[in-house]
Amino acid sequence: MAQYKGTMREAGRAMHLLKKRERQREQMEVLKQRIAEETILKSQVDKRFSAHYDAVEAELKSSTVGLVTLNDMKARQEALVRERERQLAKRQHLEEQRLQQERQREQEQRRERKRKISCLSFALDDLDDQADAAEARRAGNLGKNPDVDTSFLPDRDREEEENRLREELRQEWEAQREKVKDEEMEVTFSYWDGSGHRRTVRVRKGNTVQQFLKKALQGLRKDFLELRSAGVEQLMFIKEDLILPHYHTFYDFIIARARGKSGPLFSFDVHDDVRLLSDATMEKDESHAGKVVLRSWYEKNKHIFPASRWEAYDPEKKWDKYTIR
């Protein structure tokens, strides 16, 4: 059998190198496991935040039955958003606590390994100290390289500047949006009871459909007896064959460039309905006059044209192709 013929010092050094490689391998495994856990956590957080507003929208639809006022709709939406954000923050806090506990356990394990290693001979301890000092010097020298890109590292000043710019842009956008909402526009409509009675009314772009109907009703009551005892909740506004909810604003349709079956909702210049013209082969840029009808009239005549074409407005449904059927 072959025997090792080196000195005791060389044997001790060989043993020290073997133990050092074993420690490095264990540290590498711990680091890989930590990176994998943090990656999984980040992907879970991203998924939760991407589904946040979809979940709020679904909850809002399921909890809203019938016609509601604009204030009620906004209050429900804000309450759902706050509750959803609170749940997400609580989950994230629990996940961070779990990761912190795991890091503490890893630190305790490393301290335990160091305590066991300290039981070795003084010669091996000296070699360990020298090796650790050399590694620390090398790491320190590498960390001070001025040519290394550190833009990805946390920087409080840079983050504060970015937050300030982001807030300025948000305020500027809010001011621009409020300015657009405050602009006046003229809406041409027909009170529809089987035939059209053309009227116009001026509203702000930030007004809701309900506010528009209230203003239109004031002008129609003196000419139509059936409207003198009617309330706004008994009226419907049909635009491009879509029944528009009372809580939507004209700004919503304009900014979304929404379309109906027979034309755009956002453009309120009016022309004659192409279905009443001899040539309906080309779409015009303007939109048709909307129709204001009593809900009772619609229920009695919804199987007859043109009411048979009408359907509830759905922001998720796209009418990319022009249709007059």
Swiss-Prot record:
Keywords: Acetylation
Record InterPro entries: FAM50A/XAP5_C (IPR048337), XAP5 (IPR007005)
Inducers of expression: Imprinted. Promoter methylation of the maternal allele may restrict expression to the paternal allele in placenta.
Region span, Disordered: 92-111, 137-160
Sequence positions bearing N-acetylalanine: A2
Protein's GO biological process: chromatin organization
Tissue/organ expression: Widely expressed. Mostly abundant in testis and adult and fetal brain.
Disulfide bonds: none
A GO term from the CC aspect: midbody
Record family assignment: Belongs to the FAM50 family.
The protein, known as: Protein FAM50B
Species per Swiss-Prot/TrEMBL record: Homo sapiens
Organism lineage string: Eukaryota, Metazoa, Chordata, Craniata, Vertebrata
